[in-house]
């Protein structure tokens, strides 16, 4: 069930990243950056949308394979590490949010628990 929840979280995160243009007023804010940095911000957001959406669909569609194979365990552990690093980064960089930090910590656990639970 946590694997399905993780897939759902990834899809929600894809949609969240898709909203960055309006949520963070990028039409006005990005021109303040150099063209290169503006492009990097937008390409990173698009990349995360594609990655999160794809992984979310894979986790939901192939939950048994994710739960019962070494590759699946590696993917779960990789995402747990990703979200752990992202949680730590939330409090290092300006504009941190306790609420987002808690959400990211929950994401870490959603992927870490099934990655570390022994199968019988």
What are these regions (language model features)?
Residues 105-120:
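Membrane-water interface at the C-terminal end of transmembrane alpha helices
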Residues 17, 59, 90, 111-115:
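Structural signal for membrane-spanning alpha-helices in multi-pass inner-membrane proteins
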């Amino acid at each position: 069930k946590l694997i399905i929840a993780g897939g759902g979280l990834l899809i929600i995160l894809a949609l969240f990243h898709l909203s960055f243009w309006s949520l963070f007023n990028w039409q006005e804010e990005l021109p303040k950056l150099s063209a290169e940095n503006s492009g990097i911000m937008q390409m990173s957001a698009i990349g995360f949308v594609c990655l999160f959406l794809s992984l979310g669909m894979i986790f939901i569609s192939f939950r048994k394979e994710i739960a019962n194979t070494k590759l699946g365990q590696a993917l779960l552990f990789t995402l747990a590490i990703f979200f752990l690093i992202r949680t730590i980064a939330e409090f290092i960089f300006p504009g941190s949010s306790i609420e987002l930090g808690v959400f990211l910590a929950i994401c870490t656990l959603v992927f870490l628990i099934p990655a570390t639970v022994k199968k019988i």
